[in-house]
Amino acid sequence: VIWIGTGQIQQRWDVVDGDGVYRSVDAGQTWQHLGLEATRHIGALWVDPRDEDIAVVAALGPVFGPSAERGLFRTEDGGAHWKRVLFVNDTTGAADIAYDPQQPDVLYASLWQMQRHPWLDYFQPTLGDHSGIYRSDDGGRSWAQVAGDGLPAGPLGRIELAVAPAHGSQRVWASIQTSGDGGAVYRTEDGGAHWQQVNADKSLASSYMGWLTADPVNADTVWAGGQPLRRSTDGGTSFTIVRSSPGGDDYHALWIDPNDPQRMIVGADQGAVVTFDGGESWSSWYNQPTGQFYRLAVDNDFPYRVYSGQQDSGTVSIASRSDYGRISFRDWNPVGGDERDGDVPDPRDSNIVYGAGLGGRISRWNARTAQVQNVSPWPVSTYAKDPVTVKYRYDWITPLAISAVPPHAMYTAAQVVFRSADGGQSWQTISPDLSGADASHDTATTDCKDAPRDRATACGYGAVFSISPSPLQDGLVWVGTNNGRVFMTGNGGEHWDNVTPASLEDWSRVNLIDASAADTATAYIAVDRHRLNDFNPRAYVTHDAGKSWREIGHGLPAGAYVNVVRQDPQRPSLLYAGTSRGVYVSFDDGEHWQSLQLNLPTTGVNDLLVHNGDLVIATQGRAIWVLTDVAPLRHLAAVSPSSRQIASAELIAPAPAMRLRFNQNKDTPLPPEEPTGENPPAGAILDYILPDGFSGPVRLEILASDGSVIQSFDSENLPPKAKAKVYFAKTWLGDPQPLPATPGHHRFVWNLRYAPPPTLESEYSIAAVPEIETPILPDGAFVLPGKYTVRLSAGNKSTEKELTVVMDPRVTATDVELAELLSFQQEVAAVLQRTVTLAGETQEPKEEHQAEPGVDTPKSIATALTALAIDLEHVDAPPTEPQRAVLASEADRLKRLQAD
């Protein structure tokens, strides 16, 4: 039985909310939602070790506004019903629960009074007079405040607790955040009646990373989180760093095996790591897809690379496709920026990458030298500084964009917009303060230090948050601010129009803007109001340059606030939305939406974009994903809603297919346990839809221009496959299936090859990917670039679509050379066919070594020609003279053998 409470209590700019409590009774195979969704942020759970249906939940509650859905909640029937057993007020929630499993009736809990403001990254009001420690002696039914002497005076912030074992629940540690950016660790030996400060290191108590975990066996050992992972073996008096790195890793959680304290799991910003020796050595967090990404960009190379900055793990440039079967560490490199960076490659030269990092820093990374230059408009960092005290103020994310239109100007912004036409060597300020700040305000006064919402804008807390240059017109730029304002310039900043939608309220963050690739007057904005305690989806579109806006978020689920909306560059009515609850698609310009989750994890999507027919998304803590080839979605967007309900089988027009080899590996493949990303298919992606109630055989045929069938695939049989000796674990073998023939949408990939040539003995390729493909060689010659026909036969209907095969742009071979290669491969196949036929007509010695030396046999000829055929399949180049000589020699041997 596993219980989960959702929603972070770590107080940070992008704190993630949850939707209550879940429980599994089958070790995580299935889950049941048990309510408390309005609590939003759950800090801890206690499950009675004597009865798995009894639990207590510590709910911090909504962090951006008052709510009664906070405090301690208890259930005695497995979550069917909940009773709030401790509540102080609508701004004070519960942060932690601690107990000794040997004394399950005695529980300790901490309450935390706090509230976040949308205009602040740091300096949030995280202290309150109602924060404190509470104790229950009846399994959480009733609670009393612990007011023992020695505790610090209020106001207090986040309090984290740990109960030592074998002390009758009397020894308790508390890390307590106090005023003046202070904090310390306290300990009681009498269940809370008396406390003493045992460690004055304020970094042990914080609103973001402060936590304590007691060793389940040793009563003197306690662990603490923070930038490093720390351990005390003297009751908290001193702590030593067990694990960390320069820059800090931010450790947030620790589980210790109660039966073997040497075995632990610790969770950090990057992921989770495991130790079996008490922290002497650890596993890697690079074996799990836990990257937390903010902004996306791609380059114009092939294969294109994806760029982003992740939380506490730096920047990423990673190939969207690998030449070696799967995307691995070989396909990744950093690009010199900061954590939570927005990284944008120069559209003219992908070796130059610009990064927008902490506190307004803009960097320029050169792949040729690996050097990073600070090219900020004002190279004085404002990181972690009060925004009303600095020259230029930035939000958590510094916006950065490069125009796709020559001369490819680069834009960034604080409260004003900057433009550079020379790669950041110089900048021009091209806007006034767009945040709405009142220049007459004295920002040093206390009314701005603790400004309420109605004065925050005037005080100068606002900043530009998103920039979108038009991909159609130089100088046409849209910007949005974190306090709910939208502006547009059509002349490079000489004049700005305030085009804010009338219904957009103050401090509604304009998270991302998408300037249309189809129309200069069209733009989409994603509006995030969850920092105003409004979790409803908000997004808008204008088709008249901001004169009017239409809200398009209504069809999205409640609670799925919108981070990004992008228009498909080929189908203007096709939209994609990234929300706090996943990805959605609209086929009618936002009038209606439906889920596009498919196999995605349920997590927030911070950014997405469409490139080369692929949909690329950046998630909040679950890596980068790609939906390869959105041709089916474009097809649906192009037809009327009534036409989407098909009555007969339908073949979707395929996108151009590139001649690619799925795996070029010639070395020992990476082992199955090596973490990798999935390579996109290599070949023609063929999508077809079968109507409801369909039954019957399905066939796909590939036809040449003369109508001859190149390849055929059906739902009843797999294509004949040569036999080869399996000398490795079956993990490496894929599981090919016949064409699907069930109702619904199906996808099949043709590898753009003719059928393999006949052989007497095939072999498995070393270019293998576990559980996906270990090809049997020879694999067949590639078809030439050009036009082909795909025919779908389903039931009594046949449908044909044209398929265009194009060349890998990296290949320099001419059409004449490719035709020469194919002709030679066909010659080799013809001689092989005659050799195999002859072998079937003769009695050849069972083992090659039984033949007399120097005597020609069909097998020896076939062996040489099979090796030649395999070599020819590996490259796009005309055959060499030695290869031609081998074919001639083996053909002569065959003639002599036939004559004999």
Region spans (language model):
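Low-complexity, Pro/Ser/Thr- and charge-rich linker/hinge segments at domain boundaries
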Residues: 633-663, 802-836
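Surface-exposed coil/turn segments at beta-strand junctions on protein surfaces, enriched
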Residues: 154, 167, 518, 679, ...
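Short acidic/polar inter-strand loop motif in beta-rich domains
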Residues: 755-760, 793-801
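Beta-propeller blade termini and top-face loops
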Residues: 1-674, 681-684, 718
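Beta-strand-rich binding/interaction modules
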Residues: 365, 686-687, 694-713, 787-791
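Glycine-centered tight-turn motifs at strand-turn-strand junctions
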Residues: 709-781
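Mature extracytoplasmic or organellar-lumen-exposed domains after removal of signal/transit peptides
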Residues: 787, 794, 801-803, 836-900
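Contiguous beta-strand segments within globular domains
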Residues: 664-699, 703-704, 743-749, 832
